[in-house]
Amino acid sequence: MKFVMGLFLLVCQFFGPARLVIAADSKASWQAEWEQTVRAAEQEGQVMVSIGGYGAIIDSGVFQKTYSKIKITHITGAGTDLTQRISAEQRAGKYLVDVYNGGGNSLFQVLYQGKMLDPIKSALILPEVTDATKWWEGKQKYADKEGQYIFVYEGNVSAGAGAAYNTQLLDPREYKSYWDLLNPKLKGKILSTDIRKVRGAGIPWQFLYYYSELGPKYLRRLFGEMDVTLTADLRQAVDWLGTGKFAVGMPIQGGTVYKAKNQGLPVDEFSPYHFKEGVNLSSAFGSLALMNRAPHPNAAKVFINWLLSREGQTLFQKVISQPGDPRNSRRIDVPKDHIPPDEQRRDKMNYFDTDDPDTKDLNPAMKLLDEILAGKK
């Protein structure tokens, strides 16, 4: 017994210091890489970010204050415009943008499919960013099949099809499934934002088209049988809903309905977990990518790691969240007290993740809508 104990202590004495050296080397490795990257970024002097929707993150000045030797410049706008602009610049041989932050659909369809990105995964350096346990479900989310190019840092819970209703015309307790909205008494009383004309309407349409319990069969009945009115004017859609011209709007952006409700209009949304078919998990404008041939590659890495850090994600939630439209980072170590209980993510919930690459292509949905409407003429 004494021999075994002595052998155990001897092994501990021998391997213990080695383990400490390995741990120290590992720590020194990332620290050395980070310090070298920051020094190189300061020599580059600037970083150019194309950012859709979330310009307030940069306007806050926090990054500039933290990294005063790296001037951050940015351009904002609609994702479609920004990605098309980058595409045109690269075709002309101009590589001006370092980092793109914006909606996942335009990022995926234009920049990723156009092969204009470098792997962002290799740009992640800080342990608090690379540590998967800091992220929801213990993993980092990527919106590309390779799991390398489009980092998704936002995960908002939202009602699948983004349906809203007139509270004087409809009792939500009578409708537990999207199929219930095909009730003949609602014929001619449903309006919808037109996916072919409204920017930002893609997420609920992804759900309607790709969700297995709905899909083309449901859309054919909805638009083929229910005399749905299509509109490209979101404000008009909510006004029509509030005045009772229509009983249901699907999809309608939640923030628009929230404002109308607070103004006294008899409108409300179906809560995210209301319908039995499922719940969206969406990133809004919370997708991040590293441009290929970035003019300031080290500064790009510094910005990416900062934004994905606890500080960056806490700031993102703080400056982007609005009443009725909270933003939820996929980081689990940042505050969540601003998010209502019925919009919190739930463990072991089978969400329809709108950032899965197989559901990104909206062209089949638009083609189907054209086909259905053409058949009604």
Residue ranges and their predicted role:
Residues S106-V110, V248-D268:
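A ligand-binding cleft/hinge motif common to bilobed small-molecule-binding domains
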Residues V49, G93-N101, A247-Q253, D268-E269:
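Paired acidic/hydrophobic, glycine-rich loop segments that form the ligand-binding mouth/hinge
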Residues Q31-E42, I51-K71:
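Short, polar/charged alpha-helical segment
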Residues G286-N350:
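Mature extracytoplasmic/periplasmic domains
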Residues M1-E44, K377:
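Short, low-complexity disordered leader/linker segments with a strong preference
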